[in-house]
């Protein structure tokens, strides 16, 4: 027994026996459990150590295997060791150092030399011998026994390997799948007991990977444990108990990964904190000097001894052979030198050639191998083709069929995908068509609503109520809201005949009655009116019968009575309603055309859909929420004094509310106002009851006389009264006249022709127009009195003829056609059109409608607004609070206007600093403190939280184009204010596009509570889609090329906007307004401008920027170009010209050498040479001083004080003392005595110099010499000619004229000073300093007199300065810019003609240049820009208007174009053009407004052949859009009474406005000579391409439309698919198709049926298959996803 082993074997034999036992045990395990081999590793087994059985439970894998297992001989219980990797009692150190690194002994093997001597320690050999002893001692392991088992095995670190060790038998090999499954199971062990630990897993694991035998043999010492084998009975018992475990764990268990943060151990003691290093590196320690001994320090004996030893060691090391010797130390080695490059020798050539040859051989070998491989393949293929077996042929056929089947499947899949895409495209096209139809229906409803509102307002202006008319039209459109049965719903559907014809159960008693019988039947109805009769009379006989038209009107009356809860009339079945009954015309070119949008066929095709849609909302332009439509909510302002005036009802229960509006019951039973009445424009003023009673009196003679002759009434019905021309005579239409007179009047219109009769409007329009012509014609003749009216006055503003007439005087009674009197609070006189504007605004307020007052600037929108607020205070007793938001520049202007026109209002101007505004807000909740608050847009944004707390009654926004962008903060903030009514004031409602107009309209019409908003304007997409086509055509091709469809769309837009926009022009309402002339002045670029412009455009960076498409970069480039056009100094400042200054000239480079030479050669010590002058031995050298000066110098001499100091110093000095250095004290005294001697010598020297310097005295002195000197130049005047001078010379010297002609240098320099200043501009290329000093040497300088060295006047100084530095000439400011040159000429002409001008520009720096320009020319001017304070603006405007000496007022177009009255000027000059032409229009209206007495001329400066030409073109396009949409819409009060037959039938006067004329002058007309070539020259290439593409798209669209109306066959196909698909629920099959039926002449042609195409069948099948799938709509690219709240999320990339 050796080393404790059982058999005394060596270590080598022990290892061999251990391997054999291990292999045998593995074979046994493989044989014994082949079906469950994969699960056996998971089965807990028992092991016996020293005869004691223990449970071996697999646990989590350990990091490293222990080298020495625990000693379990003393432990009798199977308790696992703790902690997991080691026992609690650790044998040996817990850590050790290995290779300089600290390692833990828990996971690393402790080296033998570090392990302490102990009885428990076991070496590796002892460990292996212990294992062998246990194995052999138990006697249960037999190599040949198949039942022998080894220890349970697991891979290293708990991972099982892929197989077992084999002994050559095939039965012992574990299948690969089983091993893989064993690996998967081992990673996630199943049910673990709480006692399982990592130590058990490591103790019972062994390697079993056959592929890594070498690695396993190397790790065998650490992998083999001391666990003995298990008994067979106990093993199979355990296996039986866990048999089903492998089945449960057959599938892979997901691996869980839990990430936890590394725990942070807190500091429990101050010593735990590691102190920072004092030095970060050895170099820092060396540099710090710590530990170094200073040179002057005193060392202790011990330190001195240590230092001596170190030095001795260093000396020894420097000896030969030492470490620091030159032979050993590397410091003495010479620096390595770079070796020269070796020459390319023959050997290098040989090697390179050999390598190249090797490369060629390799390529050849590869080529040969590839060729051989291909040849072998070819041979194999040929052999297979020659000798094919039947099974090979069958296999090839099967393979070919399989490939074809796969390809066919792919082709079918691709075909079905294409079919699916085509079906989706067809479905999407159908969806788009349906959406277009829905949009068109919404547009038709909007037009119908606007038409009804317009007609009602028109009737009100003409003196009629119009309530019945509006009720009838409303009933026609949307039916009755209160539908209690299906029959009533069918009755209310006025636009479809399908529902009427399908309802066969109801019997219409009135269907067979004539018009006369119906009148007799319904003659006693209380609400019969003249309007109803006129509508029945004006019915079109070609479309429907007379009885039907009359019954239609009576049905409306019945609906009104039904809605009031009265006894309903007998229900009338209506047949074929004319949708154009209430329209003014069917022509496409009139303003009231095509109100219904489609014809009767379209209305019939819509069916009940239009009825359903008409009940959805109140209409397009209802500018208030649905809350206001409830009757109870309509009176919610009663407490504010805003309750409508009651109207006297006719015969008691007339079914009208207080406002004269009909009441209907909706589906819920609530009473609401009718939709059309809700948005009506009828002004219910104080005289409303009187007017209605008068209208009732007028109606009664006609409606209450059933005894009229039937023939006359039939004649009225049969005669088409709509085309009757206005009567030429002045005979008025009396309300009491019989019906025959009406027929006689209408018969006079038969001369207009049959075409007028066919295209007519209702009779009410003709009668109204006739009354207008009779009452307010050119003669302005008043009509005679009638039964119910007083003698009328001219009620049309067209009667205002003479421009020199005085404006109408205010009166308490309103003018004819006006229901609103001028409030007595208003001071001053309203003009007639302003009174009409007040009436229009009052009508909007009475009907709870918001509007836009868009009068041209200068017509008094401010006065009309003030009059409206005064009207509310007088008539409705509503004093406020009102909010007026204006630009900052006109706050004080509004305050002055309020105090001037309505001093009864209390005004608060809300502006100033934060503290001032806080003071103004104190006590402002009291309504009596102020009535109107005037503030600016900026302050509204700043103090929005405070302003939102108030409930404002009326909110007025001046210059409302500030909220044209609905995305801006201003728009969104003001939209949330709580107001009763809103009014927008703007002179430019349309500036750039229709979206801005939509923003204004939506601001007046906020959306409902559900978020959908009122139909129409609340949907920007629909609004833009409706009117997109005319906008594109106008901007791209001009207004002259609009087609008929575009004109119809524009007319529809006018119809929608007309009730809500009031727009009057100065030329229409102000006849005395002076004319306005616009001029475009083209200015050439100067040479400098052209150089800068072309240079900037030719830059590569500019071209890249313009081609990049970046909006901001392009705008920046355009702004730079505009700066060049305005003035080159804005782009690049003209530099001050200076010469290149050399620091040192060539002559002065040798100054230092010259000084050195002179000093060495000419230097003389002053004491080596006798100076007689210093010794006063040269008496005549002192004659330059006077005797008095010499006496003063002697008197001030310091000889006496110096002598006293010398005596004192002499006494203090010890002249006998010698130097004694024995002691410190004696040394210091000797040094001090030497210093005294030096001071004594210095005093003596000063005393000597003082005596010599002040002892100089002159012999005569300058005073005596000057006294005795006589001036030889001053001779007497009468002196004779000198004998030495000739007579001619003497006479020339005496002549003053000749003396003036011959000037000296100084005089000539002074005379030429102006020329030098103006023309000395060429500076030398370079200048150098020191030339004068080099030219005048010091020796020569001493011979120059003082007078010559310092002359009093230098004649060349000015020329020298001008030629050394040249400032730019002031005149270059003008000559560098072509615009300023043209402006100079224009200002001189204006000043000569007595005109005054306003100059507008966008750039503030340009204002600075204009100031310099005006100062140069001496023009008086004023300036106003954004930095001007609010208080100063009004002062400046008043000063300019009152002082005629001021020629020019220069302003910024952004700040000086808002609300400023500058009528003192009659000329407007736009120095540069604005991107937005509306801004220029506002600027020019600063002087062209009320109060201007002279014609206004407007000049626009445009630099030719530059970007400004394109800006002008774009501005003209925007002006044309404004002209077409706004100006031609005739949104005036005249339009209510100005309609005639010519307007109705579409005869428009083709007149060009000023914008079109300017466009023709600049770009010519498209129809002129040159055509497209002229456009190509004027426009950019991008614009030309865009126009051509748009033209192609239009042509293609026309072709498509034409193709839709014709028969189309798909080329290349046999037939056309069926129009109707298969029935729902049926699978489409192969069907025969015939020629489609076409509406035309039926011809008997025999057509044989032809089979359809397979593609058509596929499309039908796919469409049937996809019928239940939802349609995927394309994403809306215009909508941007909001990132609000998602800023923290990062977008993930798609992989």
From Swiss-Prot:
Task: Kindly list the biological process annotations in GO that this record carries.
Answer: chromatin remodeling
Q: Where is the Helicase C-terminal domain?
A: 1382-1532
Listed under GO cellular component are: Swr1 complex
Q: Where does ATP bind?
A: 855-862
Q: Superkingdom of the source?
A: Eukaryota
Q: Which residues form the signal peptide?
A: none
Compartments where located = Nucleus
List compositional bias (Basic and acidic residues) regions by residue number: 11-25, 626-638
Q: Which InterPro entries match?
A: DNA/RNA_helicase_DEAH_CS (IPR002464), Helicase_ATP-bd (IPR014001), Helicase_C-like (IPR001650), HSA_dom (IPR014012), INO80/SWR1_helicase (IPR050520), P-loop_NTPase (IPR027417), SNF2-like_sf (IPR038718), SNF2/RAD54-like_C (IPR049730)
The UniProt annotation puts motif DEAH box at 958-961
Acidic residues composition bias: residue spans: 499-514, 572-616, 656-678, 705-718
Instruction: Report the principal subcellular site.
Output: nucleus
The alphabetical list of record keywords is: Activator, ATP-binding, Chromatin regulator, DNA-binding, Helicase, Hydrolase, Nucleotide-binding, Nucleus, Transcription, Transcription regulation
Q: Which residues form the HSA domain?
A: 334-408
Sequence ranges of Low complexity compositional bias? 187-207
Q: What ranges does the record list as Basic residues composition bias?
A: 1678-1695
UniProt biased composition (Polar residues): 1-10, 126-137, 145-156, 538-554, 685-697
**What is the protein name stated in its UniProt record?**
Helicase swr1
């Amino acid at each position: 027994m050796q080393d404790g082993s059982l058999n005394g074997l060596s270590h080598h034999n022990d290892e061999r026996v251990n391997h054999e036992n291990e292999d045998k045990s593995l074979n046994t395990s493989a044989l014994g459990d082949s079906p469950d081999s994969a699960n056996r590793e998971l089965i807990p087994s028992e092991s016996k150590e020293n005869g004691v059985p223990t449970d071996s439970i697999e646990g989590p894998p350990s990091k490293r295997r222990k080298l020495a297992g625990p000693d379990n001989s003393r432990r009798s219980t199977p308790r696992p060791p703790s902690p997991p990797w080691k026992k609690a009692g650790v044998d040996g150190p817990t850590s050790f150092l290995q290779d300089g690194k600290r390692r833990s002994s828990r996971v690393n093997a402790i080296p033998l030399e570090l392990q302490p001597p102990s009885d428990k320690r076991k070496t590796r050999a002892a460990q292996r011998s212990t294992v062998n002893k246990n194995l052999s001692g138990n006697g249960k392991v037999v190599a040949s026994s198949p039942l022998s088992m080894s220890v349970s095995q697991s891979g290293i670190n708990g991972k099982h390997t892929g197989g077992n060790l084999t002994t050559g038998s095939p039965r012992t090999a574990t299948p690969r799948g089983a091993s893989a499954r064993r690996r998967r199971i081992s990673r996630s062990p199943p049910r673990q007991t709480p006692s399982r630990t990592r130590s058990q897993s490591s103790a019972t694991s062994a390697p079993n990977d056959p592929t890594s035998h070498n690695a396993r043999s190397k790790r065998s010492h650490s992998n083999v444990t001391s666990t003995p084998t298990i008994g067979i009975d106990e093993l199979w018992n355990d296996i039986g108990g866990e048999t089903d475990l492998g089945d449960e764990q057959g599938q892979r268990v997901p691996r869980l990964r839990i990430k936890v943060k590394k725990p942070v151990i807190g500091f429990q003691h101050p010593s735990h904190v590691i102190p920072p290093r004092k030095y970060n590196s050895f170099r820092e320690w060396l540099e710090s000097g710590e530990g170094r001994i200073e040179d002057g320090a005193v060392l202790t004996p011990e330190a001195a001894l240590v230092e001596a030893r170190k030095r001795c060691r260093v000396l020894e090391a420097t000896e030969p052979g030492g470490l620091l010797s030159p032979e050993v130390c590397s410091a003495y080695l010479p620096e390595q030198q770079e070796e020269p490059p070796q020459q390319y020798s023959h050997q290098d050539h040989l090697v390179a050639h050999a390598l190249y040859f090797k490369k060629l051989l390799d390529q050849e070998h590869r080529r040969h191998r590839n060729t051989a491989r291909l040849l072998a393949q070819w041979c194999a293929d040929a052999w297979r083709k020659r000798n094919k077996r039947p099974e090979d042929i069958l296999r090839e056929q099967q393979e070919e069929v399989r490939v074809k089947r796969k390809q066919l499947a792919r082709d079918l899949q691709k075909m079905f995908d294409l079919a699916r895409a085509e079906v989706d495209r067809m479905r999407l096209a159908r969806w788009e068509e349906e959406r277009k139809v829905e949009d068109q229906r919404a547009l038709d409803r909007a037009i119908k609503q606007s038409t009804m509102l317009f007609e009602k307002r028109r009737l009100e202006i003409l003196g009629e109520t119009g309530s019945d008319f509006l009720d009838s039209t409303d009933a026609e459109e949307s039916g009755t809201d209160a539908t209690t049965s299906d029959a009533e719903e069918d009755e209310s559907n006025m636009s479809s005949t399908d529902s009427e014809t399908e309802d066969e159960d109801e019997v219409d008693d009135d269907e067979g009655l004539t018009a006369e019988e119906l009148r007799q039947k319904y003659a006693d109805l209380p609400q019969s009116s003249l309007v109803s009769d006129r509508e029945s009379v004006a019915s079109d006989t070609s479309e429907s019968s007379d009885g039907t038209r009359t019954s239609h009107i009576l049905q409306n009356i019945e609906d009104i009575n039904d809605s009031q809860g009265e006894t309903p009339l007998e229900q009338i079945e209506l047949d074929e309603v004319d949708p154009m009954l209430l329209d003014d015309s069917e022509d496409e070119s009139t303003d009231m055309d095509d109100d219904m949008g489609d014809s009767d066929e379209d209305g019939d095709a819509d069916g009940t859909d239009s009825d359903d849609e008409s009940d959805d909302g109140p209409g397009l332009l209802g500018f208030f929420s649905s809350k206001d439509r409830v009757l109870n909510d309509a009176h919610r302002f009663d407490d504010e004094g805003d309750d409508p005036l009651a109207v006297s009802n006719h015969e008691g229960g007339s079914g009208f509310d207080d406002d004269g509006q009909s009441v209907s019951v909706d589906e819920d039973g609530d009473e609401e106002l009718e939709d059309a009445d809700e948005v009506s424009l009828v002004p219910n003023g104080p005289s409303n009851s009187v007017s209605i009673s008068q209208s009732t009196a007028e109606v009664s003679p006609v409606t209450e006389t059933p005894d009229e002759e039937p023939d006359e009434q039939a004649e009225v019905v049969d005669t088409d009264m709509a085309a009757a021309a206005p009567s030429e005579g002045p005979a008025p239409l009396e309300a009491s006249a019989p019906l025959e007179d009406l027929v006689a009047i209408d018969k006079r219109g038969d001369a207009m022709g049959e075409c007028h009769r066919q295209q007519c409007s209702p009779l009410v329009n003709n009668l109204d127009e006739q009354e207008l012509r009779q009452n307010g014609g050119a003669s302005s003749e008043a009509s005679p009195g009638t039964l119910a009216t007083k003698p009328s006055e001219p009620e049309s503003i067209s009667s205002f003829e003479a421009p020199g007439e005085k404006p109408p005087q205010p009166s308490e009674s309103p003018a004819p056609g006006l229901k609103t009197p001028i409030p007595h609070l208003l001071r001053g006189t309203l003009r007639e059109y302003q009174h009409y504007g007040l009436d229009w605004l009052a009508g909007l307020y009475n009907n709870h409608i918001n509007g836009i007052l868009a009068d041209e600037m200068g017509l008094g929108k401010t006065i009309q607004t003030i009059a409206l607020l005064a009207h509310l205070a007088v008539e409705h007793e509503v004093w406020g609070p009102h909010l007026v938001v204006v630009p900052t520049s006109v706050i004080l202007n509004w305050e002055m206007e309020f105090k001037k026109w309505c001093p009864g209002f209390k005004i608060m101007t809300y502006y100033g600093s934060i503290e001032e505004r806080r003071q103004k807000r104190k006590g402002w909740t009291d309504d009596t403190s102020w009535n109107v608050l005037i503030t600016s847009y900026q302050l509204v944004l700043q103090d929005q939280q405070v302003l939102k707390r108030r409930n404002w009654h009326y909110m007025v926004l001046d210059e409302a184009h500030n909220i044209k962008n609905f995305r801006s903060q201003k728009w969104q903030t003001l939209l949330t204010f709580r107001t009763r009514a809103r009014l927008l004031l703007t002179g430019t409602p349309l500036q750039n596009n229709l979206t801005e107009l939509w923003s204004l309209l939506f601001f007046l019409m906020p959306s409902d509570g559900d978020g959908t908003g009122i139909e129409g304007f609340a949907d920007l997409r629909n609004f833009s889609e409706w009117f997109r086509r005319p906008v594109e055509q106008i901007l791209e091709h001009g207004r002259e090329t609009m087609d008929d469809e575009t004109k119809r769309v524009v007319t529809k837009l006018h119809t929608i906007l007309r009730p809500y926009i009031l727009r009057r022009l100065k030329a229409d309402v102000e006849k005395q307004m002076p004319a306005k002339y616009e001029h475009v002045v083209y200015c050439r670029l100067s040479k400098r401008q052209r150089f800068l412009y072309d240079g900037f455009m030719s830059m590569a960076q500019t071209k890249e920027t313009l081609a990049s498409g970046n909006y901001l970069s392009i705008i920046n480039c355009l702004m730079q170009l505009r700066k060049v056009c305005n003035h080159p100094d804005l782009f690049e400042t003209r530099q001050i010209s200076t010469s290149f200054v050399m620091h040192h000239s060539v002559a002065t480079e040798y100054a230092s050498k010259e000084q050195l030479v002179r000093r060495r050669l000419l230097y003389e010590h002053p004491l080596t040479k006798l100076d007689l002058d210093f010794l006063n031995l040269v008496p005549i050298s002192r004659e330059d001083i006077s005797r008095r000066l010499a006496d003063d110098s002697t008197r001030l001499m310091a000889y006496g004080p110096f002598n006293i100091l010398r005596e004192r110093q002499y006494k203090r000095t010890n002249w006998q003392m010698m130097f004694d250095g024995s002691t410190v004290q004696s040394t210091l005294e000797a040094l001090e005595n030497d210093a005294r001697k030096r001071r004594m010598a210095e005093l003596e020297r000063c005393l000597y110099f003082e005596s010599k310097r002040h002892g100089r005295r002159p012999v005569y002195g300058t005073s005596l010499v000057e006294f005795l000197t006589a001036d030889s130049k001053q001779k007497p005047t009468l002196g004779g000619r000198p004998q030495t001078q000739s007579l001619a010379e003497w006479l020339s010297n005496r002549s003053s004229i000749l003396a003036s002609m011959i000037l000296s240098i100084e005089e000539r320099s002074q005379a030429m000073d102006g020329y030098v200043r103006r023309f000395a501009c060429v500076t030398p290329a370079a200048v150098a300093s020191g030339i004068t000093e080099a030219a005048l040497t010091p020796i020569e300088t001493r011979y120059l007199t003082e007078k010559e060295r310092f002359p009093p006047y230098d004649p060349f100084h000015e020329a020298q300065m001008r030629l050394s530095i040249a400032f730019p000439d002031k005149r270059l400011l003008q000559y560098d810019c072509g615009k300023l040159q043209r402006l100079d000429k224009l200002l001189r002409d204006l000043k000569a003609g007595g005109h005054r001008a306003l100059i507008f520009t966008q750039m503030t720096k340009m204002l600075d240049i204009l100031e310099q320009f005006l100062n140069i020319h001496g023009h008086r001017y004023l300036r106003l820009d954004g930095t001007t304070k609010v208080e100063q603006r009004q002062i400046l405007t008043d000063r300019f208007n009152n002082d005629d000496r001021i020629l020019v007022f220069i302003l910024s177009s952004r700040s000086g174009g808002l609300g400023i009255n500058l009528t003192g000027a009659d000329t407007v000059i736009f120095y540069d053009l604005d991107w937005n032409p509306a801004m220029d229009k506002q600027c020019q209206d600063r002087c062209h407004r009320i109060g201007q007495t002279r014609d206004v001329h407007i000049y626009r400066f445009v630099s030719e052949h530059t970007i400004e030409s394109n800006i002008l073109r774009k501005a003209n396009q925007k002006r044309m859009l404004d002209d077409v949409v706004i100006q031609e819409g005739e949104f005036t009060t005249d339009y209510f009474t100005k309609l005639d037959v010519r307007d109705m039938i579409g005869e428009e006067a083709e007149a060009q406005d000023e914008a079109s004329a300017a466009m023709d002058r600049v770009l010519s007309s498209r129809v002129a000579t040159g055509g497209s070539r002229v456009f190509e020259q004027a426009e950019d290439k991008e614009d030309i391409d865009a126009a051509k593409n748009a033209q192609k798209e239009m042509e293609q669209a026309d072709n498509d439309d034409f193709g839709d109306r014709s028969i189309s066959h798909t080329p290349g196909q046999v037939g056309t698919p069926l129009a109707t698909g298969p029935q729902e629920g049926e699978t489409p099959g192969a069907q025969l198709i015939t020629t489609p039926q076409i509406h035309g002449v039926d011809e008997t042609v025999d057509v044989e049926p032809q089979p359809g195409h397979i593609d058509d069948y596929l499309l039908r099948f796919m469409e049937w298959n996809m019928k239940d799938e939802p349609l995927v709509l394309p994403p809306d690219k215009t909508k941007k996803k909001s990132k609000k709240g998602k800023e923290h999320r990062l977008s993930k990339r798609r992989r």
